[in-house]
Amino acid sequence: MAGHSKFKNIMHRKGAQDKKRSALFSKLSREITVAAKMGLPDPDANARLRAAVNAAKAQSMPKDNIQRAIDKASGGDGDNYEEIRYEGYGPGGVSLIVEALTDNRNRTATNVRTAFSRNGGNLGTSGSVSHGFDRLGLISYPPGVGDADTVFEAALDAGADDVESSDDGHDIWTSIDSLHEVAKALEAKLGEAEGVKLAWRPTMKSEVADEATAQTLFKLIDTLDDDDDVQTVWGNYEIPDAVMEKLG
């Protein structure tokens, strides 16, 4: 569910802004409903649901929409979505993890496989790349919230494990179990985050220094992210600033 010189989760969206927002809310609602169905429909008693609700709030999703998504699960309404993770290699050999929630496994698998094959990638088997990532909590803030030292001190006091700061913003990493508590503590000091979610963090990064390769990689990620069933695309790529400037 954005590529720059410091690996980041990619959320390139095409089309009108309202269409992008609608698609984002749809994906957020789907995650909330699935999380509520898998556990208790109470964010305080369901860690995954807490993360999903926090992510929705960070994107300014209306409270009524959030509650409807939870009610859909507790009321037994809605489609039965299956959680699937796809793993593969993109242009330049970068590792990609694609998280999907689908009511039609065959449709989603076909779409994901086609996206990889048409954009210089290769869909792998389960576990083929995830061994190179850690499963963690991620809290994101825009650059304007403060300088690197300010955010680092706030994150340290909140109990975070690590911080990555760049011109694009601040990524604060936590264990999955402490994500909710750290997010609450940070909100008291820095304000509402722009993203709170479960994430895949690469243990090693792969540099893509060729402009054409980077462009094809972004096209692949855009294609995947535009699929309604795809929730999030994670990667271990790192794009040098000079290449990003050429790509605009």
Curated annotation (Swiss-Prot):
Cellular location(s): Cytoplasm
GO function term, MF aspect, one: DNA binding
GO annotation (BP), single: regulation of DNA-templated transcription
Major location (coarse): cytoplasm
Record carries keyword Kinase: no
Keywords noted in UniProt: Cytoplasm, DNA-binding, Transcription, Transcription regulation
Gene3D superfamilies listed in its UniProt record: 1.10.10.200, 3.30.70.980
A single Gene Ontology CC term: cytosol
UniProt keyword Protein transport, yes or no: no
Region (Disordered): 1-22
Biased composition (Basic residues): 1-14
Superkingdom of source: Bacteria
Membership in a protein family: Belongs to the TACO1 family.
Protein name: Probable transcriptional regulatory protein Sala_0337
Organism: Sphingopyxis alaskensis (strain DSM 13593 / LMG 18877 / RB2256) (Sphingomonas alaskensis)
